């Protein structure tokens, strides 16, 4: 069968199609015929830099498909079921602990860029028929990270205001979930065209951070000086000081990305002054995933898929993400 892997070296140009034997499920295992995958910033880092992973590696964390074979003792799913892979293959429920985070797909475990993928049966969840395979493939990392951020760790509801940075996958999911939960949303971007698309999705206010670099102060103005209840922080060092300006006293900054780089500049006085909570978020449990999918089905909420590439154009898809030219999610089809 076909697999897309970094065999001897990392780098987009070194992610190539190879052949591997057909997988055979053992006890408690299943094989999934992969139908779609989606890109995350983590995948770009893994392919280009390795991100601490060893070669050879099949990258990409998020995919969806149909169960094509089951091993002995499997009862959670059956052949033909539509399923999503789960990023953490060992976090099923309960609070996050080190062991729960020890087996992520797409590094160090082989990821979803394979025609047929063997996994533990506990490492997938069923997906509703109302979602296409491409839509479902966006959920395991980006969707679940946004859900855990504003529905679990820093829950929002009617009367609350959140600020989402940019228009990538997690931020757009956070916008959609926040509106469904009844909250107000301020969205930022450097692109007026993307901000108009964010408004079409329900954003109450938008700020172009390129033309208005003091967007933290602007968020204060938009909330009559109070500040926002939650900031969905994706930029890291480049944006954290502005997030601390924007957040209200006693509010929360949920840190889910490091697009601005990996430095240690944390603005301690501002954090103290705001009595703000800073929460690191990386994906979630299977139980949280299932809760998210149930709410999405009830709300008839569909993920925003911006571009779809055939899997043999995966290098082009990664280059699009690298250029920041997307709104929402980029997907691959098998």
Predicted regions and their residues:
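C-terminal capping/lid region of NAD(P)-dependent oxidoreductase domains
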Residues: 225, 300-304, 315-334
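Glycine-rich beta-strand-centered segment in the early N-terminal region that forms part
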Residues: 21-37, 47-92, 106-110, 128-131
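Adenosine-nucleotide cofactor-binding segment
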Residues: 161-167, 179-239
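NAD(P)H dinucleotide-binding glycine-rich loop of Rossmann-like/cofactor-binding domains
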Residues: 88-165, 200
């Amino acid at each position: 069968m076909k697999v897309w892997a970094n065999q001897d070296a990392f780098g987009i140009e070194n992610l190539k199609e190879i052949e591997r034997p057909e997988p055979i499920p053992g006890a408690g295992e299943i094989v999934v015929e992969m139908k779609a995958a989606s890109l995350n910033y983590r995948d770009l880092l893994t392919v280009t830099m390795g991100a601490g992973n060893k070669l050879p590696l099949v990258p990409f964390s998020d995919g969806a498909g149909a169960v094509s074979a089951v091993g002995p003792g499997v009862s959670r799913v059956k052949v033909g079921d539509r399923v999503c892979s789960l990023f953490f293959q060992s976090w099923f429920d309960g609070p996050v602990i080190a062991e729960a985070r020890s087996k992520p797909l797409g590094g160090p475990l082989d990821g979803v860029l394979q025609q047929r993928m063997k996994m533990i049966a506990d490492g997938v969840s069923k997906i509703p028929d109302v979602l296409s395979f491409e839509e479902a493939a966006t959920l395991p990392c980006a969707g679940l990270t946004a859900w855990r951020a504003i529905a679990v760790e820093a829950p929002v509801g009617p009367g609350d205001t959140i600020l989402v940075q940019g228009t990538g996958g997690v931020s757009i999911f956070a916008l959609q979930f926040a509106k469904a939960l009844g909250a107000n949303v301020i969205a930022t971007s450097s692109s007026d065209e993307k901000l108009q698309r964010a408004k079409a999705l329900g954003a109450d206010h938008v700020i172009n951070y390129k033309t208005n670099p003091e967007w933290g102060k602007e968020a204060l103005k938009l909330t009559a000086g109070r500040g926002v209840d939650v900031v969905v922080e994706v930029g890291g060092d480049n944006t954290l000081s502005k997030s601390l300006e924007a957040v209200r006293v006693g509010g929360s900054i949920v840190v889910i990305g490091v697009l601005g780089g990996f430095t240690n500049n944390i603005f301690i006085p501002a954090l103290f002054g705001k009595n703000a909570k800073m929460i690191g978020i990386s994906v979630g449990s299977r139980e949280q995933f299932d809760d998210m999918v149930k709410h999405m089905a009830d709300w008839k909420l569909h993920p925003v898929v911006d571009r779809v590439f055939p899997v043999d154009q995966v290098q082009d898809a990664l280059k699009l993400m690298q250029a920041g030219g997307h709104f929402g999610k980029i997907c691959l089809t098998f």
